[in-house]
Amino acid sequence: MHKFLDGAKSEILKYDVISFDIFDTLLLRPFIKPTDLFWYIETKYNIKGFHQARILAEMQSRKLSKEQDITLDEIYHQIPKEFHSYKEVEIATEKEMLVPNLEMLELYRFAKENNKRVIIVSDMYLPLEVLEDILISKGFGGYTNFYLSNHIMLTKHSKDLFKHVLKQENITHTQMLHIGDNSWADGTMPKSLGIATLFRKSVLKQLEEVFPKYKTFTPTSVAQSFILGSLCVFYKNYIQKHEKFDYWFLLGAMQAGIVAVAYCQFIYKEIHKRNIDTLVFVARDGYLLQKIFNILYPNSYKTAYVYAPRILKKAVFLEVVESESLEILRILEGEEEVKKKQITTNQQAYVYLYSNFEHCRHLALKCLDNYRRYLYSQNLEGNIAIVDTITLGYSSQGLIQKALNKEVFGCYVDLLRILNYNCVSFLPFSHPKPIYFHNWDFMEFLLTSPEYPILNVENGVPIYQKDVSSCEKYRSKAYEKIVEGAVGYASYFKESQISLGIYDVIEWVNFFIDNPSIQDQEQFKQIYFLPDATHKNALPLFCNDVSLLSCILKPSQSYGILKRSLRTNKQERLFKILSLIKKIYGKLKKK
């Protein structure tokens, strides 16, 4: 960005008159295509058919017109009567959604500061007074003249508008520099008249140069158009401006930020229907979600971040399985007491728990009482809703309900089964299998915390796992950057968020999962996830080490890793082959 700005400023100093295009140059829409604005209006106001009718009306108006350009009034003259009243809505929506291009704002101000004659030259159907109002409100005031195609009825596209500009400004072509994004209207046409040009690709093209895989992403909803369009604007105005090129920061904005914003929108709608006083974000999944919720809906609800580790719930409810017995016993007895008893394995702990069940039940009640005091210290007032991501056993909701001795409401991204709990799911429980995240562990990675795994809460303080691995330390550091990116994105677009549905988010996340770049694969080499309650058994989030050779030598182990991890296209084929072999082997074994 700075290289372009330095070169552009040098060019500006050479000329007397600096001309700027408006759309995709001075002003940016957070959509992939200009016509997606009409799609947004149709969706927001629930006016079926407006999107297509507005496009067709403009096409018909241009076909009938004998002039080089048309006005907004002429377009609405061709639209069906039921849509006539939406002309003012379209204008208001443009004003609401348009964002200044900060790179161009810097050049615009530089030109004025150096006493250049700044003019606006644009092909556009919106009325002159509307565009003048928008430009001033976005920081582009103080220009000398405004040459608008639908006002003069000459266009840049035909180059006649540029001829008109030279005449009106009383200058030669050598005195003028034009800046724009359209290769024909802002490049070829002025150049044919000898006018110098400064071509700057659209923000979408600039994003695609950095992230080539998004060239193949095709939005299937206006929300998805907004997702990619808003990220283009964010990348342009925030990331490049602040030189935030860290991979995890970008992932935070482009994945975690999108998911968190969508889920928080859902949470707000759901608890708004209910008499909720306090919103409890459960650690660790609620860490980022609380930050995003407070950005989007400040002061709307009291929020708290509360620890309710799964292993603590198992200890309190004495839900003992051998593989977790040692951790459960440490919670109940205390680590020093377990050492004194010389219990060092899960098997020993399992035997002890069942041999001393009444004693352990007493310790579990004491543990619950300690946890209750912790919750009371958080001042959780009135009716409570908890926020978590996914649940099978409702561990956090069950633990908090047990400790507070009252029902709490639960918000989840997904429910793996329905039990007798008062809750709601972002993803409908009856969802068909194909409509789902291709790798839930990636979602868990996006919605978590930089904290290490939590085992217990003592005296109001979380007790973190001590013997954390190097990969967990790496994940923690990476996630700090992810939080920065997600919070940055949510803060930037908090005023102009449109509703993002669960299926919009699923398609967006799955596109990333299914199309990992070489950079993605490289960065994820050190990222592991911990699927069990003890947080001991780490698995790679991206199966970098699974090759054809490993599939041949260790087919069962390779299958297990591939099943849980993000897969490249090559690994996807290996996984299908292993799945088929496993299926055939299973049938032969039955015989």
Regions found by a protein language model. Name each.
Residues 119-121, 125-175:
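Substrate-recognition "cap/lid" segment bordering the active-site pocket of phosphatases
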Residues 163-171, 177-179, 188, 192-591:
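Long, low-complexity, Lys/Arg-enriched
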Residues 29, 38-42, 108, 124, ...:
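Nucleic acid-processing catalytic cores of prokaryotic defense/repair systems
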Residues 45-57, 80-92, 139-148, 173-175, ...:
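Short, surface-exposed acidic
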Residues 53-74:
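N-terminal accessory alpha/beta regions
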Residues 6-53:
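Active-site neighborhood of HAD-like aspartate-dependent phosphohydrolases
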Residues 67-120:
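Short, acidic loop-to-helix structural element flanking the phosphoryl-transfer center
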Residues 7, 103-110, 133-134, 189, ...:
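A short acidic, amphipathic alpha-helical/loop segment
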